């Protein structure tokens, strides 16, 4: 069945090609085609044959044609052939040539009044460029432009805007007229786009080989980055060869996104381009709407078109070029025009015109024929063919095809949108079924371990590592929704990445730049420097700079009570107590006070010290001081003690109720102002680059960052900076160091610190964010960003955050000291020193008491001789009695022992008065201590003694063997001591009849009377 049309076509072709113009034929059409467009001639003759077989249009009339082939870039040849056709007599001229030759034919047609239907043809199938102004449609011109104006600039600009491209390269082949995209370049320049141009030589292999031979490695890497986004103004054949070459030489990767724009892209070309390309491919081509009724697709204007041309599934129809379609519709339009002219009986016969003959007149029927053609319109292979007042065809439609995402080269192609001059872009270039198309796609993810974003959850020998963290949870949420899978690995150098001196990038960013990974995931911040080499999704968490510091340690200081004063001050106070005590003693010794009868002076050095100490601690003194010098001294001392004690009390309250913060840093400004506490960050990180840029850039220099940069960059950055964040956190915890890093990371560290010894300080200004990095031009960026926004809108992102940053943390993240249970209560540690001093005093007192008891018992075990005891006790008695005789004002009284009567003494009461015993030393430089007693009865006895009896004492039967003598001096304690001139003789003991007194074993008594 398919053989017959082909045979019929060949028979018709040969018969028309060699058939001369019939003398009785009134319809003659001339045609001039480019010599390389043999297919135009084939379709032209096929259209004439179809119309000659259709009796409904021209009835009995037949169309005859004359075809000439010319060089498309030779205007003189085109004019010469056109004149030859006009000399034969033609009703219309059809041409399918380039703009250069068309301009000459336009002038000739205007001069000869021959309707000229021009079908612009681009050389070698390259995209069309607008013809020069002299070749464009004018209202009074005889040239009609069958093909619509060139709208490629408008279409490609809207596509690029839809893709939000900011940087790309345009490739064009040698046959393309670069002047055709002048308007497009102007539009991109106004939008601030960075567009590069590169001409593709005819020998593509040699061109690529030359680039590899002449470019350095760094230049090739940059060139690969440029190729991620490209627009190709090429013929389908050149585009196939170019794509094949760059893919085989590994100049492009699966993240590339290319746009091929050309009206002349057939269905077969689309399939071949998709098969050869990788990444995402977008194709823009002209399309022709088909009737929705499939049975009417080959019936147009009462004319049945050849099935091989109108059936989209027919291979011959798929191979049709756009110029072929317009040529067929042009013949159909002329046939309908001739039909109307015949019906209106306004037919003008053909005339033989001479272009060379001088004074040749134009065709008289040309104007009428032109108006009839312009008013007509047909629906053919190009949908609707008609002309406006300017003589151009306004009907044009474009379709935008796009490949699915993924690495499978056998993926399909779908229509993403359409475009026309009236409605513009109709549709979206985003594949709505992307989530289904990503199923089966395996992404290679590079990461850097950073708590809590990415952590190793399980590491079993021989099995792949398992990761967890906030960023991993976000990636899993995307994978579950979009259907892709991923393989994850850690960056070899464990760095986020920065640009090196040679222009290359290291770390995680370097893995993306060198195409070793598809996605970069961690606590990765979005910075302008990184955005210049990689693409980022929208931020999934805000970012701010923070500082990690160690809280002030609440150490147990048992002697915190001594903290208000410095050790040197305490030493001065102790020395002052000793000095003042000594001065008080000396002042009293030099000018002793006058004591009343019966008083005992206690102004010893020990008592003076005790008095000064007691007054210092506000406990008062026991010994009265009456001299003016001593009182003056004590008054000044009390004033001194008042000031010292008041100052101590106030400072002690401050020390015990207010925690002294060693590190009072509450903001980045506080950190920058101080220099005592060193601080730093991670080398080659975003924080490092941020501090450096704001601290050194003269256009955005910040004083705070300038101070921080001086500290961070000390000794070239090696002193205060670390290689990874874990090292910085460790330095803070176990040393004097402040770590400047991402606030989110530091908050997680402070929350999970076992002893809650860390706190954070941040600026709370989220000028940046965390995002997922992808290769430049990655097709996954937009859909990832869209899904992240959905997670944020429905609250799922907040749930993931609470998993790693809980609100009910046991640690206070922002307090520089440990929290207390009560704001006013003081703990035992604040007063431990006081209790220790008290305990030490108790122990020391017990020890002294033990020593005293031991010493007393040891002293009592040494029993003295009776002679010594008798002599000393009796002598003491004399002294004590003399001290009671206050009637006589003489300081030196002489007594006679015979005048003293001891009989009235109640000796039974003497043992009860043992508490009145007193240790006195009345004998200087003798080292003899006498033990005596002053019973209450002796005071009564002293009152009965007369001043006259002071000359001597009657002791009854006691014989006085003592040689009397005067006492020359009074002892300081109020008693007497022996004169250094007279030496008292011993008084022998004589028994006196009296009751027996039993003192028991009294160790304090040496003599019994």
Swiss-Prot record:
SUBUNIT field: Tetramer; dimer of dimers.
Keywords: Calcium, Cell membrane, Glycoprotein, Ion channel, Ion transport, Ligand-gated ion channel, Membrane, Metal-binding, Postsynaptic cell membrane, Receptor, Signal, Synapse, Transmembrane, Transmembrane helix, Transport
Binding site for Ca(2+) 2: 753, 755, 757
Extracellular side: 24-566, 657-830
Glycosylation sites: 293, 306, 390, 426, 713
Free-text tissue specificity from the UniProt record: Expressed in cerebellar Purkinje cells, in crest cells in the medial octavolateral nucleus and in type I neurons of the optic tectum.
Protein name in UniProt: Glutamate receptor ionotropic, delta-2
GO CC terms, sorted: AMPA glutamate receptor complex; dendritic spine; plasma membrane; postsynaptic density membrane
Residue ranges crossing the lipid bilayer per the database entry: 567-587, 636-656, 831-851
Recorded name of the encoding gene: grid2
Domain of life: Eukaryota
Listed SMART domains: Lig_chan-Glu_bd (SM00918), PBPe (SM00079)
């Amino acid at each position: 069945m398919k053989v017959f049309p082909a045979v019929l076509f060949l028979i018709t072709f040969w018969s028309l090609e060699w058939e001369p113009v019939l003398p009785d034929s009134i319809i003659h059409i001339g045609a001039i085609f480019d010599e390389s467009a043999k297919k135009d001639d084939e379709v032209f003759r096929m259209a004439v044959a179809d119309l000659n077989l259709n009796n409904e249009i021209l009835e009995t009339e037949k169309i005859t044609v004359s075809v000439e082939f010319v060089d498309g870039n030779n205007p003189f040849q085109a004019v010469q052939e056109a004149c030859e056709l006009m000399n034969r007599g033609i009703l219309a001229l059809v041409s399918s040539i380039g703009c250069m030759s068309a301009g000459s034919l336009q002038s000739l047609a205007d001069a000869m009044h021959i309707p000229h239907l021009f079908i612009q043809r681009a050389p070698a199938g390259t995209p069309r460029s607008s013809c020069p102004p002299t070749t464009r449609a004018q209202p009074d011109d005889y040239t009609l432009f069958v093909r619509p104006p060139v709208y490629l600039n408008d279409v490609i600009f809207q596509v690029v805007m839809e893709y939000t491209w900011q940087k790309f390269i345009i490739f064009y082949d040698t046959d393309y007229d670069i002047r055709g995209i002048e308007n497009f370049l102007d539009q991109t320049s106004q939008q601030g786009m960075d567009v590069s141009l590169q001409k593709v030589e005819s020998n593509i292999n040699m061109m690529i080989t030359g680039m590899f031979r002449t470019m350095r490695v760094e230049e090739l890497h940059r060139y690969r980055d440029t190729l991620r986004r490209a627009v190709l103004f090429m013929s389908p054949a050149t585009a196939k060869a170019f794509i094949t070459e760059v893919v085989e030489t590994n100049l492009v990767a699966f993240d590339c996104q290319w746009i091929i724009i050309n009206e002349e892209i057939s269905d077969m070309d689309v399939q071949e381009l998709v098969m050869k390309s990788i990444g995402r491919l977008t194709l823009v081509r002209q399309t022709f709407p088909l009737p929705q009724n499939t049975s009417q697709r080959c019936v147009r204007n009462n004319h049945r078109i050849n099935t091989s041309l109108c059936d989209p599934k027919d291979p011959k129809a798929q191979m049709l070029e756009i110029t072929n379609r317009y040529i067929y519709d042009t013949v159909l339009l002329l046939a309908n025009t001739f039909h109307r002219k015949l019906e209106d009986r306004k037919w003008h016969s053909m005339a033989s015109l001479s272009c060379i003959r001088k004074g040749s007149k134009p065709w008289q029927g040309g104007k009428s024929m032109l108006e009839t053609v312009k008013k007509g319109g047909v629906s053919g292979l190009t949908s609707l063919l008609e002309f406006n007042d300017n003589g151009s065809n306004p009907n044009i439609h474009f379709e935008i095809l796009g490949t699915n995402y993924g690495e499978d080269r056998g993926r399909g192609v779908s229509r993403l949108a359409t475009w026309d001059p009236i409605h513009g872009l109709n549709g979206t270039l985003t594949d709505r079924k992307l989530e289904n198309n990503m199923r089966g796609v395996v992404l290679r993810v590079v990461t850097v371990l950073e708590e809590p974003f990415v952590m190793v959850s399980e590491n079993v020998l021989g099995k792949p590592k398992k990761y967890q963290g906030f960023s991993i949870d976000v990636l899993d949420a995307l994978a579950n929704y979009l259907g892709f899978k991923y393989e994850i690995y850690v960056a070899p150098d464990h760095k986020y990445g920065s640009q090196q001196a040679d222009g290359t990038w290291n770390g995680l960013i370097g893995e993306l730049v060198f195409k070793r990974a598809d996605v970069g995931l961690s606590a990765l911040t979005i910075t302008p420097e990184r955005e210049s080499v990689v693409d980022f999704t929208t931020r999934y968490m805000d970012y701010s700079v923070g500082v990690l510091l160690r809280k002030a340690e609440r150490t147990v200081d048992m002697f915190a009570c001594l903290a208000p004063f410095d050790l040197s001050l305490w030493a001065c106070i102790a020395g002052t107590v000793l000095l003042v005590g000594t001065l008080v003693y000396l002042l009293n010794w030099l000018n002793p006070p006058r004591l009343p009868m019966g008083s005992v002076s206690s102004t010893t050095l020990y008592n003076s010290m005790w008095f000064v100490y007691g007054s210092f601690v506000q406990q008062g003194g026991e010994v009265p001081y009456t001299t003016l010098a001593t009182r003056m001294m004590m008054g000044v001392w009390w004033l001194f003690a008042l000031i010292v004690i008041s100052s101590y009390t106030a400072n002690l309250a401050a020390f015990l109720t207010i925690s002294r913060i060693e590190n009072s840093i509450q903001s980045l400004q506080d950190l920058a102002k101080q220099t005592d506490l060193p601080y730093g960050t991670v080398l080659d990180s975003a924080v490092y680059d941020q501090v450096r840029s704001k601290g050194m850039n003269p256009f955005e220099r910040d004083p705070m960052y300038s101070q921080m940069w001086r500290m961070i960059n000390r000794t070239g950055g090696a002193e205060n900076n670390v290689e990874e964040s874990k090292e910085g956190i460790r330095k803070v915890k176990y040393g004097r160091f402040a770590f400047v890093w991402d606030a989110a990371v530091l908050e997680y560290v402070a929350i999970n610190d076992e002893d809650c010894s860390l706190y954070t300080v941040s600026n709370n200004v989220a000028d940046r964010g965390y995002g997922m990095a992808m290769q430049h031009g990655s097709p996954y960026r937009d859909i990832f960003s869209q899904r992240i926004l959905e997670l944020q809108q429905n609250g799922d992102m907040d749930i993931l955050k609470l998993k790693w940053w809980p609100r009910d943390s046991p640690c206070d993240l922002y307090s520089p000291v440990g929290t207390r249970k009560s704001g006013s209560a003081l703990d035992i540690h604040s007063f431990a020193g006081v209790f220790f001093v008290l305990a030490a005093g108790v122990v020391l007192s017990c020890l002294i008491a033990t020593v005293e008891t031991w010493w007393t018992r040891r002293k009592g075990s040494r029993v003295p001789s009776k002679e010594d005891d008798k002599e000393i006790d009796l002598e003491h008695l004399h002294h004590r009695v003399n001290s009671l005789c206050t009637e006589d004002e003489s300081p030196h009284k002489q007594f006679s022992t015979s005048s003293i009567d001891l009989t009235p003494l109640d000796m039974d009461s003497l043992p009860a008065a043992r508490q009145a015993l007193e240790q006195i030393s009345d004998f200087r430089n003798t080292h003899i201590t006498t033990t005596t007693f002053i019973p209450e009865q002796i005071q009564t006895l002293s009152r009965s003694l007369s001043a006259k009896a002071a000359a001597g004492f009657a002791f009854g039967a006691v014989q006085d063997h003592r040689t009397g003598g005067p006492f020359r001096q009074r002892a300081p304690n109020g008693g007497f001591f022996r004169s250094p001139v007279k030496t008292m003789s011993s008084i022998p003991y004589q028994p006196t009849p009296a009751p027996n007194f039993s003192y028991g074993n009294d160790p304090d008594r040496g003599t019994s009377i």
